[in-house]
């Protein structure tokens, strides 16, 4: 049975799982007497757990200004919905995933103002301005993002940008695995 819009909330003894299904949240007007949510108790003989990963933010002043988003959210807008999150997007990252976001934006025809990578000596993977060994120190704008301030060895400068995608890397989602006394193991090959 496929259960869309359902989140497993816990793992319990005997192969029992708690799951919350959002039934009518996505509808402007649901069927009469339909519940908003159903909490399911699922008992399974066997389970495949694919918990995925959660993107980490990068903290800096005013990182909660409208127009500042996680890089994975920007890629969802671009790749799933063909929607540009801005006209001049900057990417602040410490890993290769931020560069992937810039390439996806370029493929949709969205302007990439800059990729700001905290790592030294990184090479651009596409046709976009790259500031390696740099960081975002401030965001500017009254009703939303209008520019960002970055700092590198060359000093500080301000770049016009109406969207800032942030990627601080990925953490494996091990919550449910740990409910079952599973322990994460590092594997260099994956």
Regions found by a protein language model. Name each.
Residues 1-190:
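Residues forming the flavin
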